[in-house]
């Protein structure tokens, strides 16, 4: 059973995506912000993290992704966001870009259809990202 950490402040989307992932056989832990995400990871390391780009402020999701990639380089990350938010933050981040500035296996524009998210999670897990 794959353990997925779903990090997003939108409770409605979290509920929909969690239900779809659980129905697909995944064990899902949720967090609404970076503090909750870090606490959840401290309790149990997930097999994959799905996170919103814009947590707790302009770049908190990006910062969390970079931090997780540094400490857990084999942990697959899928990032969700509204396209305009990602582009704006990516432009700001480009000022100090390096090869690991966006260490995610997949960007997905919100709202993501639950079945599409399930497919991407399954694909990332099977690919061994």
What are these model-predicted stretches?
Residues 11-29:
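Two-component/phosphorelay signaling modules centered on CheY-like receiver
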Residues 33, 59-63:
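Acidic catalytic/metal-coordinating carboxylates
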Residues 36-38:
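Short alpha-helical segment
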Residues 63, 83-109, 115, 119:
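Alpha4 helix (beta4-alpha4-beta5 surface) of REC/receiver domains from two-component response regulators
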């Amino acid at each position: 059973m794959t353990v997925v950490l779903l990090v997003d402040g939108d409770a409605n989307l979290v509920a929909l995506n969690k239900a779809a992932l659980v129905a697909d056989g995944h064990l899902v832990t949720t967090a609404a912000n970076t503090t909750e995400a870090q606490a959840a990871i401290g309790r149990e390391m997930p097999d994959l993290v799905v996170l919103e780009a814009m947590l707790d402020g302009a770049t908190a999701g990006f910062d969390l992704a970079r931090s997780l990639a540094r400490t857990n380089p084999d942990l697959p990350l899928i990032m969700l966001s509204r396209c305009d938010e990602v582009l704006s933050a990516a432009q700001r981040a480009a000022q100090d870009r390096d090869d690991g500035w966006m260490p995610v296996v997949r960007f997905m524009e919100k709202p993501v259809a639950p079945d599409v998210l399930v497919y991407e999670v399954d694909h990332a897990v099977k690919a061994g990202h």
